[in-house]
Amino acid sequence: MPTEGVIDIVCNLFTEEEVRLGRTGVDEHFLDQVRFPRELRNGVSVEVYLEKMDRAGIQRSLLIAVRAGDLRVRHSFEIPYERVADICQKYPDRFSGLAGVDPTRGMQGLRDLTHAVREYGFVGAHLYPHWFEMAPDHARYYPIYTKCCELEIPIMMQVGHCLRYQKDRVLPSVGRPITLDRVAIDFPELTLIGIHVGYPWTEEMISVAWKHPNVYIGTDAYAPRHWQSPLVHFINTWGQDKVLFGTDWPVIDPERAVADVGELGLRPEPQQKLLRENALRIFRLPESNQE
C-alpha cells in the first residue's frame, strides 16, 4: 500500500470557525450517529488536519465550498468560495477547491462558478441534491451541467440515501444512482462522479458507471472495511479506472480510511488507481507538490 501521494476527492472544512458559524450542516445527533469523537466536535484546525493527512499519506485533499440548500430556507448553509480559496492559496500543494452549486441562484450562481474556476483555480463542482429536494436529473440543474461542460470541469454529487443531519430538518433521499443515467446521456462531455458510493444502491451505481464512459464513483462517507463486496470486486478488476478515493471528512477519518483500503486485498495497480491515479487524471491535478 502506498504511504504517500494519496488524493482525497471529498473533504469538508470542519474548523472551529465553521462549527461556530453553523457551516457544518450537522448537529450533535448526527455526530453521535457517526460516532464522531467528542474531543473533536468543536472543530479541527486546518493545521491539525494537515497533520492527519501527513500521517495518512494523503498528498492532496479537494476541499468543498459547500452550498447546501436555498439560503432562504431554515438550516440551509454555505461555506463561501472565498473561504476555501484562501486556504487553497495558503496551502497550494495540499488543497484544491471544489465549488458548491445551488440551482436556486440562477445566473448569479453560474457567474459564481465561473469565477471560482477561472479566478480561484477550483478544479471541479459539487452538488448536494437532497438539500434542494430535487433528483440529479431535474431540469433546474441543467444550466449548471452546461456551465461545467463549458468550463471543462467534473461535477460530483451525493447519490444514494441521506442521513438525518439535523433533527429539525429531515431531507428526502432523492439521489438514486440511476438518475445519473439521463444526465450522462444528455451531457456526454460532462464528467459525473457519484459520491457516497450510492449506498444502499451501490450495485446500481456500479451499473451506471460501467454503462457510461463519463460516469465515475467516489468512495467517501463509508469506511472501506464496510464497502460491499461487489464494489471491492469492481475496483479490483473491470472497474479499476472508474473509482476514486474520498473520505467526506469529518464523517470518515483519513487515517482510518487509508489503512482500511490496505486491508481490502486489492492488487497494487487497481489500488494505486483508486488512491491516486484516477483523481489525478479526472481533476487534472499536478503529479507532485512541486509542479
Q: Each PLM stretch: what is its role?
A:
Residues 1-60, 114-115, 239-244, 252-291:
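Mid-to-C-terminal alpha-helical segments outside catalytic/metal-binding sites
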Residues 6-9, 63-64, 98-99, 126, ...:
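Active-site neighborhood of phospho(di)ester-bond hydrolases with catalytic His/Asp-centered motifs
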Residues 44-52, 79-85, 111, 177-180, ...:
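Alpha-helical scaffolding within the catalytic cores
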Residues 10, 53, 84, 88, ...:
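Conserved, mostly hydrophobic/aromatic
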Residues 14-17, 68-71, 103-106, 161-165, ...:
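Active-site environment of divalent metal-dependent phosphoester hydrolases
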Residues 17-22, 75, 110, 167-170, ...:
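Short aromatic-enriched loop/helix-cap "lid" or pocket-rim segments at secondary-structure transitions
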Residues 59-60, 65-163:
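Active-site gating/metal-coordination segments in enzymes
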Residues 120-124, 134-244:
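Catalytic pocket-lining loop regions of alpha/beta-barrel enzymes
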